[in-house]
Amino acid sequence: MGPSQPASTCVHLAPSLQLDAMSDPRNLQPQNQLQFNRNVPTNPRNLAVRYSCPHGIKIEKLKHSYNELNHGKDLDFKAGNELSSSVSFSVISEERLSYAVHLAKRDVKRRQFEEHVKDHLRSLPHSSHKGMHTKVERKDSKSQDVCHCSHQPSRVSLSSSGAKVYVYTSQPGRSDLTVPNSPPTHDPGLQLQPRIEENKNLWEQKGLLEVQRLQKELSGCIRKIEALTKKDRLEEALDPDEEHRIRVRRQEQAVRCARMLYVLQQQVKEIQEELDKLSPQKIKHTKKSWAVSRLAAAHRAAIRALQVFVTQFTDRGEHPVPARCRELGSLIRQLSLCSAKLDADPSVPDVVIDILQQIEALESLLEKKLSPKKAKKCFTEIRSRFPVGSQKILERWPTVLPKSERRHLVTKETFPQETSRPPVAKRLLAAMCQPDGELQRLESEPDVLDAHLLPEEAPRIEDNGTDFKDGTLTPAKPQAVRRKALTGSMPIRKKDTVESARPQQGLHIAERNRPNQPYSKSRLQQTTVSSRLKMNRQPMKDHRAPWIPPNPTSPPASPKCAAWMKVKYSPRDAAKEQSLQQEDIHKESQLRGDAEQEAARLSWPDAESSKRLKELEELEAKEMERKQKQRLNWLEAETSRRTKELDELKAEEMDRLQKLSVSATQLADKVEEAVLERLKPLLIKAQRVNSSVEANSHLKDRPSRHAAAAAQPAEQASDVPFESRNIPQLRDCLEDTAHELWARTQDKILGSETSARLGDSKDSPDLETMMLRMEEMEKYQETVRQRYNKIVYADPHLWMHEERNDQNTPAVSEGPLASHPIKITKTATQKCPAVNILLERPCNANSLDESVTTEEGSEKREAPLPLSREDLHQRKGQTPLSVPPRMRHSIGAYCSRFEQFLRIIAHEAIGSFNPWLIAESFSDELVDEALGAVAAELQDVCEDYAEAVFTSEFLEAAA
């Protein structure tokens, strides 16, 4: 808490001006002017800073001295246009203010609750006997005293400064708080009994309201289902998205409903366990109130579950959930039996019977919902057999009516249809309609039941756990138990017995006027077995005086006492008592049989539902086993089929590899034969040239200058054709030899590899197939890369033509082909086609020149070779674009700069730039230079050889 800061100056508003001061302009003041009071005394309490805990709300005011107060009064009396002292304000912290608001709200709620209790107690009817009148008057007076004590009008006091202060005075010995639910630690006395009885009545009325709400909800549910069965629902065709949403919503509703049913089942189980622990004779007030509140909460949960079920039923139409409906019906039935067992209110058994009948009607209606033609007929039969709560009963559920009015309503609405009711329902209703006169007769004659009860039933009274559940099936008036307990502890007054005999006489007169119901008349004269078993009675006492041996010194008994004892215990009374006992035994056996029959009838749906659930579980387990077997069989068949397919593929692959190996060896042999055939004439030529060179080498030293000068013109004439004849022959011979040797070595390498693969494939065929597949994948990847690197101008007509060609010629790889986008890029440069040079053996010496000329002519003719089909298709599919020269120049400059940049930094192929291709071109150039050097040397050798041949021939001719 912060420090409380008192105000050092006081402010007030001048609301109006005085009429007499209007003439003086100096005294004129504007309206609503702020005026500051500087005459506040310098009291240390006004200026000190104090710290305090928020124990209570304190209204602190500024204090004035006595003289200043009197002086202010004189000023107020003399001058009316000025205020001598302003209104004093106090400083209150926010925490204190919020706490005060909280307390005020609590007081308002308490006052509203007590007013509601007063109105409820005033609306309750007065009972017929005087005891109830006195009790109600005592309750009203007590409630009025409590309200008067707790809500006295606050006394308003005016301070000297004019501030209004509300002072609340509390009376000692009075408390606004209600009596707690915990048991007292000492004897509270008789003054707290009316408040406890009032709380009991409130809890009982609360439980009755919840039961009646459940009854009303059940009747509404039956009406809605009946309306749905009467009208035909047409299913509309929905979109797939809408159907999916509906399916998801239904799944969520099913999960929510299952969760609610599980929670309700746990609540019912806990309530049943607690009620089994509680003894029917000695139920404490706190435990009973706790049980009533738990029952009310369970009833509210059942109402919510019933509303969810009705919503699902109206949404799904012809697809109800019968298992959940049966489970909910059994839970509501158990709740109703628990409320009847607790005996919270006398009218609870009537409502419980109605709820049980409504549950039976609902279950039978839902069972016959699948056959719409029989539904209407079935529901009319159900309504005739079990009258569901009618409109009058539903209209009166929020208000609590007296027992006499409730009895008249029940007799009006249910007894005309007794002809169609089952006999057990008749007996239960007859037991419910027992009047108060019978209870008063039991009050006035507490020993009648003790006399009617047989000695054999005494051990059953002590062991209540066995017959307590059966007693709930035939509920009786719970006030008989309480009144019996009260009369057993208090002496019976004569006045009360006389007053209780009067309604009993009226009851007998009313029963004489109804001769058509002899069974109910006999039933009304006796109590039920459950009520007698619930009564807390002492063991049977013999009212006769115990036998005392006569004392010779004692005086003899008086004749009056002897005659009284003889008259009281006459044989006629003994016979009458024996006949009454026999009649009680007969009725008890009959009632026990009826109770067992009713218990069997009520437990039949639970047994039937459990039986059906077991059957459903067995069917589900069988279905799961069947599905599992089918799945395993399918898996076995699939695995066997796939293994067969793999074996077939393996065999096919082995056959293909064998064929490939055979074809490879055959191809290698053919290539070797062809190479040998081509090499034989070349070797013969080489040998001839070599022999001629060796034969004419010794003639190089012999030629003379004369011979050389004479032979010079002839040499010039014959040198050119000889040179031109020998050099191309040697060059072609060397090239052919190199190519054939390379092809032969490659074939040998391939043959060795295939043989090694075939040898390995026998051991590991899977590895061989994997390697072949990887090679195919690499080839396909290379084709894809070439396709993407290939830059063409394409159009849809070309695509259609290519698709037709692809359909006509099946591809080797069945992989997916890329799409054909429109590309505007640069085409790759085409290499010049290789020129085939054919060497033929000359027929004579002069034919070499002709062959040379023919070869040159053939080269000229073969230079413009026709393009392939692919090039023709590309040219047909190309689209020419007109590009300005400046733009073309800028594009070329950019490409050159980019290639120069790539030459500096790049080591991989990017676009059209390929460093390895450049390296290969460099290597080709180097090889060409080397070949040129070799050719030059060979040409020199040939020149020397020609010179030697010329000299030899010239010398021979000269000689």
From Swiss-Prot:
Renumbered to this chain, the Basic and acidic residues biased-composition regions fall at 134-145, 456-470, 583-599, 857-874
Cellular component (GO) terms are: centriolar satellite; cytoplasm
- Is Cytoplasm given among the entry's keywords? yes
Q: Where is the composition biased (Pro residues)?
A: 547-558
What segments bear the compositional bias annotation Polar residues? 515-533
UniProt lists compositionally biased (Low complexity) regions at: 707-717
Protein location: Cytoplasm, Cytoskeleton, Microtubule organizing center, Centrosome, Centriolar satellite
Give one Pfam family, short name only: MNR
Q: Where is this region: Necessary and sufficient for CEP20-binding?
A: 877-959
- InterPro entries per the UniProt record, alphabetical: MNR
Major place of residence: cytoplasm
> For the modification Phosphoserine, which residues carry it?
279, 691
Q: Give the region (Disordered) as residue ranges.
A: 124-156, 456-560, 572-610, 692-721, 848-883
Could you tell me the keywords of this UniProt record? Coiled coil, Cytoplasm, Cytoskeleton, Phosphoprotein
Biological process terms from the Gene Ontology for this record are:
centriole replication; cilium assembly; cytosolic ciliogenesis
Which residue stretches, if any, does this entry annotate as coiled coil?
Answer: 582-674
Q: What does this protein do?
A: Involved in centriole duplication. Positively regulates CEP63 centrosomal localization. Required for WDR62 centrosomal localization and promotes the centrosomal localization of CDK2. May play a role in cilium assembly.
Quaternary structure (record): Interacts with CEP63 and WDR62. Forms a complex with OFD1 and CEP20/FOR20. Interacts with PCM1.
Q: What is this protein called?
A: Protein moonraker
Source organism per UniProt: Mus musculus (Mouse)
Lineage, please? Answer: Eukaryota, Metazoa, Chordata, Craniata, Vertebrata
Q: Tell me what gene encodes this.
A: Kiaa0753
